[in-house]
């Protein structure tokens, strides 16, 4: 038996990073109760999404994340050829996702964000602190992808133009400030305060929602929806967070307000997945490369 176990190959570095990315997406989807988002209770403000579809979509993205990490290891330079390679792989991953979901956009924003971060992590696996990985991802995001086919403006791009807000592209080019300054610090604070992991992750999501100019919310509900999201998320945290009785009441009020406006904070959900991915990279710090 021991000889058999010894022959089982360790997952490669690229496989580990792809596993972490898909795991972050699945854990984000499973987290409950998220205000107006798909979770274990139901579909939130969505009519075309459910938890089963979110799981299937996340698993369908594993080959794309794996290929991005492999590209980073083989090309080994943070330059335009790598940027264009992962852009192509991301588009292929999106096509696979849409085939699995029947055309429903479940994780387009997450492909962009986590694709950059998987690539950035694989480029320098000895330097996996969240700030280091996010800065490398930002440098990648700023590079032009000359192979990007012409497309009509997305919902997010139209929202950016209408309201003059930052979108997913700007968030990445800035090094994911919503995660580095808000999501990750709140996750750690809530853990340090004794919260269980579910409540710590909910608090991290709320910290992101409290400051993010979420283009998904703006698309569905305009500035009224954005104010509802930001003010409501802040109210939960001020009340003591999702683990407190007052915080749970405020969380319920937030959800009811968002549902009334048909607003779903999908951008914040993507950044929570980023938060969970970066958080899981830290235990890999200092580990021998062969052990990853």
From Swiss-Prot:
Swiss-Prot/TrEMBL GO biological process terms: prosthetic group biosynthetic process
Gene3D superfamilies: Triphosphoribosyl-dephospho-CoA protein (1.10.4200.10)
Reactions catalysed according to its record: 3'-dephospho-CoA + ATP = 2'-(5''-triphospho-alpha-D-ribosyl)-3'-dephospho-CoA + adenine
This enzyme's EC code(s): 2.4.2.52
InterPro entries, sorted: CitG, TriPribosyl-deP-CoA_syn
UniProtKB keywords: ATP-binding, Nucleotide-binding, Transferase
One of the record's GO molecular function terms: triphosphoribosyl-dephospho-CoA synthase activity
PANTHER family: 2-(5''-TRIPHOSPHORIBOSYL)-3'-DEPHOSPHOCOENZYME-A SYNTHASE (PTHR30201:SF2), TRIPHOSPHORIBOSYL-DEPHOSPHO-COA SYNTHASE (PTHR30201)
HAMAP family for the chain: MdcB
Family of this protein: Belongs to the CitG/MdcB family.
Role description: Involved in the formation of 2-(5''-phosphoribosyl)-3'-dephosphocoenzyme-A, the prosthetic group of the acyl-carrier protein of the malonate decarboxylase.
Record NCBIfam families: malonate_mdcB, PRK01237.1
Protein name as it appears in the record: Probable 2-(5''-triphosphoribosyl)-3'-dephosphocoenzyme-A synthase
Origin organism lineage: Bacteria, Pseudomonadati, Pseudomonadota, Gammaproteobacteria, Pseudomonadales
């Amino acid at each position: 038996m021991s000889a058999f176990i010894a022959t089982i190959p360790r997952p490669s570095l690229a496989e580990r990073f792809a596993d972490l990315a898909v795991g972050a997406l699945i854990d984000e989807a499973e987290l409950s109760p998220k205000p107006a988002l798909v979770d274990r209770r139901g579909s939130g403000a969505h009519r075309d999404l459910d938890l089963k579809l979110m799981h299937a979509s996340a698993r369908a993205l594993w080959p794309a994340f794996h290929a991005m990490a492999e590209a980073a290891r083989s090309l080994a330079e943070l330059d335009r050829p790598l940027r264009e390679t992962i852009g192509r792989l991301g588009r292929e991953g999106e096509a696979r996702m849409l085939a699995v979901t029947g055309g429903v956009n479940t994780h387009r924003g997450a492909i962009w964000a986590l694709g950059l971060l998987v690539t950035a992590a694989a480029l320098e696996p000895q330097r996996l602190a969240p700030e280091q990985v996010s800065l490398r991802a930002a440098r990648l995001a700023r590079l032009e992808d000359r192979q990007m086919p012409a497309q009509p403006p997305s919902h997010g791009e139209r929202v950016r133009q209408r309201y003059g807000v930052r979108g997913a592209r700007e968030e990445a080019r800035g090094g994911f400030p919503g995660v580095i300054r808000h999501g990750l610090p709140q996750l750690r604070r809530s853990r340090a305060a004794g919260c269980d992991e579910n409540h710590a992750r909910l608090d991290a999501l709320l910290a992101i929602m409290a400051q993010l100019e979420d283009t998904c919310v703006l698309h569905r509900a305009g500035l009224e929806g954005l104010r509802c999201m930001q003010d409501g998320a802040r109210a939960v945290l001020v009340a003591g967070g999702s683990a407190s009785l007052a915080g749970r009441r405020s969380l319920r009020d937030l959800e009811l307000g968002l549902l009334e406006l048909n607003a779903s904070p999908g951008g914040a959900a993507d950044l929570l997945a980023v938060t969970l991915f970066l958080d899981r990279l830290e235990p890999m710090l200092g580990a021998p490369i062969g052990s990853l």
